[in-house]
Amino acid sequence: MSRGQTRDFRFFKGAALCAALDAEPPVSVRLNPAKTGADTLPAGPDAGLPVPEAAGLPALAIAGRVPWSRDGRYLAVRPSFTLDPDFHAGAYYVQEASSQFVGHLLEGVRTEGARILDLCAAPGGKTTLYASLAGPDGLVVANEIDRRRASVLADNVRKWGTGNVAVTTCEPRALGDFEAWFDVVAVDAPCSGEGMFRKDPDARGEWSEGNVKQCAARQDEILRE
């Protein structure tokens, strides 16, 4: 991070933030309750030691629960996800714990049977979370204007397997005709990507104040539409 960025983050103790961004990110997943019975899975012993094999998911060494996510689990080690049949079967989704916080924000909202619009949905992590919350009587419209990213979104939705998600590729303004039809509208708008700093070293070099301003303008446009 630049000196200017550290200054801008002084309220959050810029030096500590920089150190956190340099640290190895924890590995977390969100279990698919329709395929795993997530509520019955162990969250790891009190000592924080991993559970080598957890309720039919042998590739996952579960270290503990994500506090704000019913189905979220931290892993003690990062497995080879691409070699795990359970990953490809949609038994879980690899998702940062911070991204799972949206489920906590919806705890006071009646989501069972709800109609939910995920306006900027790819790659689908939050979409699958909404699908689990909405249940079989609900509907999630997962929208992504980029067709390449929408293809990835559709693949992840198919793997999750809840059968209550429709993938669309509309401009936000096209969905404006459905005013007051959705019970929940979620907008994970395009952002400047600081959250990628820990995972992708190239992300730091691609960051710029110009990109931040461009993203802010796009966010404002999406909300107005």
Residue ranges of predicted features:
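S-adenosylmethionine
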Residues: M1-E225
